[in-house]
Amino acid sequence: MTVFYLTNAHPDIAWDWNRINTSDIHFPSSFAWGTATAAHQVEGNNSNNNWYQWEKAVDENGISRIHNNDSSAMAADHWNRYPEDILLMKDLGVSHYRFSIEWSRIEPQKGYYDLESLSHYRKMCLALINAGITPVVTLHHFTHPIWFEELGA
């Protein structure tokens, strides 16, 4: 909404925030302020999905796909630190948190469902609700299990 307004009011490629009057920008009281993440990018410690394989692969010249051969590895360790992250969200004043469920964690092998992972996501949702934050779940955010990749994805 704001970006649309600013783009129309100030079509320059770069906006000079010192010259832009934002006092007339208002959001309705029902506007949902939130944050968002993708499981593989924040949870960390997941070597069972297609993105992990892509991070480890090299191009046709043998060069790592990612500068310095970096990887998401532990990422932000949201898997273990979600209680702290939820406190930060609460302090930020958001009302919603959109996150993804990592398919390769809940179904690491075809037809096998990891109850501990399902329980983990349930606990995280309950912690969000207890903090007054509405969980908004994305069931598939780009990554999928290696077994699914091997089937042709």
Where are the regions that the model predicts?
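N-terminal carbohydrate-binding accessory modules
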Residues: 4-94
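Substrate-binding cleft and catalytic face of glycoside hydrolase catalytic domains
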Residues: 43-46, 86-153
